[in-house]
Amino acid sequence: MGCSASKDTTNSKDGAASKGGKDGKTTADRKVAWERIRCAIPRDKDAESKSRRIELFKQFDTNGTGKLGFREVLDGCYGILKLDEFTTHLPDIVQRAFDKAKDLGNKVKGVGEEDLVEFLEFRLMLCYIYDIFELTVMFDTMDKDGSLLLELQEFKEALPKLKEWGVDITDATTVFNEIDTNGSGVVTFDEFSCWAVTKKLQVCGDPDGEENGANEGN
Protein backbone atom coordinates (compact mmCIF):
# COMPACT_ATOMS: atom_id res chain seq x y z
CA MET A 1 0.00 0.00 0.00
CA GLY A 2 1.38 3.38 -0.97
CA CYS A 3 1.28 6.54 1.08
CA SER A 4 -1.67 8.73 0.32
CA ALA A 5 -1.48 12.42 -0.45
CA SER A 6 -3.80 15.04 1.00
CA LYS A 7 -7.24 15.12 -0.57
CA ASP A 8 -9.98 17.73 -0.89
CA THR A 9 -11.08 17.55 2.76
CA THR A 10 -7.51 18.11 4.00
CA ASN A 11 -6.40 20.89 1.70
CA SER A 12 -7.18 23.48 4.36
CA LYS A 13 -6.23 23.52 7.99
CA ASP A 14 -9.87 24.20 8.97
CA GLY A 15 -11.01 21.07 7.15
CA ALA A 16 -8.47 18.91 8.90
CA ALA A 17 -9.17 20.34 12.32
CA SER A 18 -12.86 19.45 12.05
CA LYS A 19 -11.97 15.77 11.84
CA GLY A 20 -10.54 15.48 15.36
CA GLY A 21 -7.70 13.05 16.14
CA LYS A 22 -5.64 11.66 13.29
CA ASP A 23 -6.62 8.05 14.01
CA GLY A 24 -9.18 8.01 16.80
CA LYS A 25 -6.52 8.11 19.52
CA THR A 26 -5.67 11.23 21.49
CA THR A 27 -2.16 12.58 21.90
CA ALA A 28 -2.26 11.44 25.52
CA ASP A 29 -3.32 7.91 24.47
CA ARG A 30 -0.40 7.68 22.08
CA LYS A 31 2.15 8.97 24.58
CA VAL A 32 1.16 6.37 27.17
CA ALA A 33 1.13 3.53 24.63
CA TRP A 34 4.45 4.63 23.12
CA GLU A 35 6.31 4.31 26.42
CA ARG A 36 5.53 0.59 26.42
CA ILE A 37 5.74 -0.10 22.69
CA ARG A 38 9.13 1.51 22.09
CA CYS A 39 10.64 -1.01 24.50
CA ALA A 40 8.65 -3.92 23.09
CA ILE A 41 9.92 -3.69 19.49
CA PRO A 42 13.44 -5.21 19.25
CA ARG A 43 14.78 -3.29 16.26
CA ASP A 44 18.38 -2.58 17.31
CA LYS A 45 21.43 -4.38 15.89
CA ASP A 46 23.00 -5.55 19.17
CA ALA A 47 23.09 -9.22 20.15
CA GLU A 48 20.39 -8.93 22.81
CA SER A 49 17.94 -7.28 20.42
CA LYS A 50 18.64 -9.87 17.75
CA SER A 51 18.00 -12.67 20.24
CA ARG A 52 14.69 -11.06 21.18
CA ARG A 53 13.89 -10.65 17.50
CA ILE A 54 14.50 -14.34 16.85
CA GLU A 55 12.09 -15.29 19.63
CA LEU A 56 9.51 -12.77 18.43
CA PHE A 57 9.75 -14.11 14.88
CA LYS A 58 9.09 -17.62 16.18
CA GLN A 59 6.04 -16.37 18.06
CA PHE A 60 4.72 -14.70 14.91
CA ASP A 61 5.48 -17.81 12.82
CA THR A 62 2.47 -19.83 13.98
CA ASN A 63 2.79 -22.24 11.04
CA GLY A 64 6.45 -22.95 11.75
CA THR A 65 7.50 -22.36 8.13
CA GLY A 66 10.23 -19.81 8.81
CA LYS A 67 8.30 -17.34 6.65
CA LEU A 68 5.56 -14.90 7.60
CA GLY A 69 2.46 -14.07 5.62
CA PHE A 70 0.65 -10.79 6.15
CA ARG A 71 -2.04 -12.36 8.35
CA GLU A 72 0.56 -13.87 10.68
CA VAL A 73 2.29 -10.51 10.97
CA LEU A 74 -0.94 -8.62 11.64
CA ASP A 75 -2.11 -11.18 14.21
CA GLY A 76 1.25 -10.93 15.98
CA CYS A 77 1.11 -7.15 16.04
CA TYR A 78 -2.31 -7.35 17.67
CA GLY A 79 -1.96 -10.34 19.96
CA ILE A 80 1.73 -10.26 20.94
CA LEU A 81 2.90 -6.66 20.62
CA LYS A 82 -0.57 -5.14 21.19
CA LEU A 83 0.19 -2.27 18.85
CA ASP A 84 -3.49 -1.39 18.54
CA GLU A 85 -3.12 0.46 21.85
CA PHE A 86 -1.35 3.17 19.83
CA THR A 87 -3.49 3.41 16.70
CA THR A 88 -6.77 2.33 15.16
CA HIS A 89 -5.06 2.19 11.74
CA LEU A 90 -2.84 -0.78 12.54
CA PRO A 91 -3.77 -2.93 9.48
CA ASP A 92 -2.78 -0.11 7.09
CA ILE A 93 0.51 0.53 8.91
CA VAL A 94 1.39 -3.16 9.04
CA GLN A 95 0.57 -3.60 5.35
CA ARG A 96 2.93 -0.76 4.45
CA ALA A 97 5.64 -2.17 6.72
CA PHE A 98 5.17 -5.65 5.27
CA ASP A 99 5.45 -4.40 1.69
CA LYS A 100 8.40 -2.11 2.43
CA ALA A 101 10.32 -4.90 4.17
CA LYS A 102 9.83 -7.25 1.21
CA ASP A 103 10.91 -4.60 -1.28
CA LEU A 104 14.00 -3.46 0.62
CA GLY A 105 15.00 -6.96 1.66
CA ASN A 106 14.89 -8.25 -1.89
CA LYS A 107 16.73 -5.19 -3.21
CA VAL A 108 19.58 -5.41 -0.68
CA LYS A 109 20.03 -9.17 -0.61
CA GLY A 110 18.74 -10.12 -4.03
CA VAL A 111 16.74 -12.93 -2.44
CA GLY A 112 13.45 -13.40 -0.64
CA GLU A 113 9.90 -14.56 -1.13
CA GLU A 114 7.68 -12.22 -3.13
CA ASP A 115 4.68 -12.45 -0.80
CA LEU A 116 6.33 -13.44 2.48
CA VAL A 117 8.64 -11.87 5.05
CA GLU A 118 11.58 -14.00 6.13
CA PHE A 119 13.78 -13.43 9.15
CA LEU A 120 16.35 -11.36 7.25
CA GLU A 121 13.54 -8.90 6.40
CA PHE A 122 11.84 -9.02 9.81
CA ARG A 123 14.00 -6.26 11.31
CA LEU A 124 13.21 -3.96 8.39
CA MET A 125 9.51 -4.46 9.02
CA LEU A 126 9.86 -3.77 12.75
CA CYS A 127 11.93 -0.65 12.00
CA TYR A 128 9.22 0.66 9.68
CA ILE A 129 6.49 0.13 12.29
CA TYR A 130 8.64 1.67 15.04
CA ASP A 131 9.50 4.66 12.88
CA ILE A 132 5.87 5.31 11.92
CA PHE A 133 4.88 5.32 15.58
CA GLU A 134 7.83 7.51 16.54
CA LEU A 135 6.99 9.92 13.73
CA THR A 136 3.39 10.08 14.94
CA VAL A 137 4.61 11.26 18.34
CA MET A 138 6.98 13.72 16.63
CA PHE A 139 4.20 14.99 14.37
CA ASP A 140 2.05 15.64 17.44
CA THR A 141 4.73 18.04 18.72
CA MET A 142 5.41 19.62 15.29
CA ASP A 143 1.73 20.29 14.59
CA LYS A 144 1.46 23.14 17.09
CA ASP A 145 -2.12 24.17 16.26
CA GLY A 146 -3.47 20.60 16.23
CA SER A 147 -4.73 20.91 12.65
CA LEU A 148 -3.25 17.53 11.60
CA LEU A 149 -1.35 19.38 8.87
CA LEU A 150 2.14 20.89 8.74
CA GLU A 151 2.88 24.31 7.33
CA LEU A 152 6.34 25.25 6.06
CA GLN A 153 7.23 27.21 9.19
CA GLU A 154 6.28 24.29 11.46
CA PHE A 155 8.43 22.03 9.30
CA LYS A 156 11.41 24.41 9.50
CA GLU A 157 11.13 24.60 13.29
CA ALA A 158 11.30 20.79 13.46
CA LEU A 159 14.56 20.44 11.49
CA PRO A 160 16.69 19.85 14.62
CA LYS A 161 14.35 17.05 15.72
CA LEU A 162 14.47 15.48 12.28
CA LYS A 163 18.28 15.64 12.23
CA GLU A 164 18.44 13.99 15.65
CA TRP A 165 16.02 11.34 14.37
CA GLY A 166 18.28 10.57 11.42
CA VAL A 167 17.23 12.81 8.52
CA ASP A 168 19.43 15.86 7.86
CA ILE A 169 17.88 18.59 5.69
CA THR A 170 19.80 21.51 4.17
CA ASP A 171 17.04 23.12 2.05
CA ALA A 172 13.80 22.98 4.03
CA THR A 173 11.64 24.73 1.44
CA THR A 174 12.66 22.43 -1.40
CA VAL A 175 12.17 19.31 0.70
CA PHE A 176 8.80 20.55 1.99
CA ASN A 177 7.59 21.05 -1.57
CA GLU A 178 8.78 17.55 -2.48
CA ILE A 179 6.83 16.08 0.44
CA ASP A 180 3.73 18.11 -0.46
CA THR A 181 2.97 15.84 -3.39
CA ASN A 182 -0.28 17.52 -4.44
CA GLY A 183 0.95 21.11 -4.04
CA SER A 184 -1.64 22.03 -1.41
CA GLY A 185 0.80 24.14 0.59
CA VAL A 186 0.48 21.92 3.65
CA VAL A 187 1.74 18.42 4.45
CA THR A 188 -0.42 15.60 5.79
CA PHE A 189 0.87 13.00 8.22
CA ASP A 190 0.77 10.34 5.49
CA GLU A 191 2.92 12.47 3.19
CA PHE A 192 5.33 13.32 6.00
CA SER A 193 5.69 9.79 7.38
CA CYS A 194 6.05 8.14 3.96
CA TRP A 195 8.89 10.52 3.07
CA ALA A 196 10.65 10.35 6.46
CA VAL A 197 10.56 6.58 6.89
CA THR A 198 11.82 5.97 3.37
CA LYS A 199 14.71 8.40 3.92
CA LYS A 200 15.69 6.83 7.22
CA LEU A 201 15.53 3.24 5.97
CA GLN A 202 17.73 4.19 3.02
CA VAL A 203 20.36 5.39 5.50
CA CYS A 204 20.23 2.84 8.32
CA GLY A 205 17.81 0.08 7.36
CA ASP A 206 19.45 -3.22 6.47
CA PRO A 207 18.32 -6.83 6.70
CA ASP A 208 19.38 -9.15 9.49
CA GLY A 209 22.19 -11.52 8.61
CA GLU A 210 21.03 -15.00 7.74
CA GLU A 211 23.46 -16.46 10.23
CA ASN A 212 21.99 -17.19 13.66
CA GLY A 213 18.58 -16.57 12.19
CA ALA A 214 15.13 -17.58 13.34
CA ASN A 215 15.52 -21.16 12.17
CA GLU A 216 18.44 -21.72 14.51
CA GLY A 217 17.62 -24.32 17.08
CA ASN A 218 14.38 -25.41 15.36
Swiss-Prot record:
Q: Which GO terms describe its molecular function?
A: calcium ion binding
Binding-site residues for Ca(2+) 2, renumbered to this chain: D143, D145, S147, E154
Cite the residue spans of the region called Disordered: 1-27
Tell me what organism the protein belongs to: Trypanosoma brucei brucei
User: Which of UniProt's keywords are assigned here?
Assistant: Calcium, Cell projection, Cilium, Flagellum, Metal-binding, Repeat
Query: So which residues are the signal peptide here?
Result: none
Family per record: Belongs to the calflagin family.
Residues of the EF-hand domain:
48-83, 84-119, 130-165, 167-202
Q: Where does Ca(2+) 1 bind?
A: D61, N63, T65, K67, E72
Stated name of the protein: Flagellar calcium-binding protein TB-24
What's any one GO cellular component for it? motile cilium
Task: Report the domain remarks.
Answer: This protein has four EF-hand domains, three of which may be functional calcium-binding sites.
Pfam families annotated for this entry? EF-hand_7, FCaBP_EF-hand
What coarse category fits the chief subcellular location reported for this protein?
Answer: other
Can you tell me which residues bind Ca(2+) 3? D180, N182, S184, E191
* Localization in the cell: Cell projection, Cilium, Flagellum
Q: Matching PROSITE patterns, A to Z? A: EF_HAND_1, EF_HAND_2
The cross-references to Gene3D superfamilies, in alphabetical order and at most eight, read:
EF-hand (1.10.238.10)
Q: Does the keyword Oxidoreductase apply?
A: no
According to its UniProt entry, the function of this protein is described as: May contribute to the rapid motility of the trypanosomes, playing a role either in flagellar structure or in calcium metabolism. Could alternate between a GDP-bound inactive form to a calcium/GTP-bound active form.
The record's section on InterPro entries has: Calflagin-bd, EF-hand-dom_pair, EF_Hand_1_Ca_BS, EF_hand_dom, FCABP_EF-hand
